[in-house]
Amino acid sequence: PHNYSPDLYRRYSTYCRNYDGNSLFKIASGASDYDYNWTKVLMDRVGGRMHGLSLHYYTVSGWNGSKGSATQFSKDDYYWTLGKCREIEDVIKKHCTIMDEYDPQKNVALMLDEWGTWWDTEPGTNPGHLYQQNTLRDAFVASLSFDIFHKYTDRLKMANIAQIVNVLQSMILTSGKNMVLTPTYYVFKMYNVHQDATYIPLELNCDMMDVRDNRRIPMVSATASKDPNGKIHISMSNVDADNAQEVTINLSGTKAKKAVGEILTSTNLTDYNSFENPDNVKPVPFKEVKINKDILKIKLPAKSIVTIELQ
């Protein structure tokens, strides 16, 4: 397939032409997670003929047998999930390094067109439809993924969760005329302030945890940006299931006088929104934040996701 794919791309892209003043953005079918040789071969053979190269990465325990329940899991399972989720950064970094070798000007975009959690389908549903529930654990997969994606936007130009409605880690679940918004939906909503904004690099120092399969995860994840109106937004996740985290941020040069925000959390990691209880997990105003001169102090409750706006 590594040698066959460039030939297929070359063949079909030749017949995909621009018409009526429109320009096609041609994306080659790229690798799944750790298949770095796929990226190397495509960039070597057709890198100058494409505009983008796709990549898939799922937070999944394996492709054979049970993938685990979406709503019934242990704390150990939760931490393993976050470790697997965060490994996407290493995957993105390695694919980007290969692309840089052939395309140092970054003309070819990396397009992460499938990502998210993949659990066993909900009991009683059609297995082929991949319908799964969505808990606070899935919300953390979304927030940690966003924090990582934000760091690589010089190459990563698209990151599509799979999918939006009723499939895998979706943002919306429907049943007949009923609709429910998932915890993942609310993370998307809380992070939309970073769209069309300028990324602000963060230096983050926090405790680390060793998790299953020889992975390590930081207890706090974060990202920040400045929007076109000059407002700074900071999103943070405290992944510690049991303990709050005190976060201190140096705001030197921002002239911020106050901060407002919202928080997404729940009593249990396994909590989710159902058609019977659609508002079980949703954001509420967040007030545990103080500014003293150039120092921002935030108390993040256990298992919480927060976005604040500096004013």
Please give the residue ranges for each predicted region.
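Short Pro-Gly-centered flexible turn/kink motifs
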Residues: 299-310
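Conserved, mostly hydrophobic/aromatic
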Residues: 12, 53, 95, 114, ...
